């Protein structure tokens, strides 16, 4: 059986891993073992954070919507309740963009939500009295 020499493959493997770790500080970009450990951790962090990013953006959108709603005299939860009652289906990403970039359109949406909440509030009282 022929002898297998692995120097070329091993060097290529090490070279590609060190190239992956090229932006890291100190030994983590120069020494193979340290670089390998750091690259493995980096991949785990990126996997985790790709999932966390969805929640982070939703949280940011809610903060922006709440700030815009409070500027128009309504809280976030009342705004969302009013949008559901009014049958307005706009997602939080678009609402946040409107709150930041188009205050007039956002104010119009808030007014429709406020009217729907007020109508539901008076309708409920009238139904109980009857």
Swiss-Prot record:
Q: What domain of life does the native source organism fall in? A: Bacteria
User: Which Gene Ontology BP annotations are present?
Assistant: ribosomal large subunit assembly; translation
SUPFAM superfamilies, alphabetized: Ribosomal protein L20
Query: What InterPro entries does the annotation carry?
Result: Ribosomal_bL20, RIBOSOMAL_L20_CS, Ribosomal_protein_bL20_C
Q: Which GO terms describe its molecular function?
A: rRNA binding; structural constituent of ribosome
User: One Pfam family this chain carries?
Assistant: Ribosomal_L20
- Where in this chain does the entry annotate a coiled-coil region? none
The answer, when asked if Ribonucleoprotein is one of the entry's keywords, is yes
A GO cellular component annotation in the UniProt record: ribonucleoprotein complex
Keywords, sorted A to Z: Ribonucleoprotein, Ribosomal protein, RNA-binding, rRNA-binding
RNA-binding among the record's keywords? yes
What's this protein's family per the entry? Belongs to the bacterial ribosomal protein bL20 family.
Purpose: Binds directly to 23S ribosomal RNA and is necessary for the in vitro assembly process of the 50S ribosomal subunit. It is not involved in the protein synthesizing functions of that subunit.
Q: Mind telling me what this protein is named?
A: Large ribosomal subunit protein bL20
Source organism? Salinispora tropica (strain ATCC BAA-916 / DSM 44818 / JCM 13857 / NBRC 105044 / CNB-440)
Gene for this protein?
A: rplT
């Amino acid at each position: 059986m022929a002898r297998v020499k692995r120097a070329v493959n091993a060097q290529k493997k090490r070279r590609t891993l060190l190239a992956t770790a090229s932006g890291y500080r100190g030994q983590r970009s120069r020494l193979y073992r340290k670089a390998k450990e750091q690259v493995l951790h980096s991949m785990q962090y990126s996997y985790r954070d790709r999932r966390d990013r969805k929640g982070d953006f939703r949280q940011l959108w809610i903060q922006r919507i709440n700030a815009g709603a409070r500027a128009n005299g309504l809280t976030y939860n009342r705004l969302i309740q009013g949008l559901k009652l009014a049958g307005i289906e706009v997602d939080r990403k678009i609402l946040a963009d409107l709150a930041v970039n188009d205050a007039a359109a956002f104010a119009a949406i808030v007014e429709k939500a406020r009217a729907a909440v007020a109508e539901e509030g008076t309708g409920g009282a009238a139904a109980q009295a009857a």
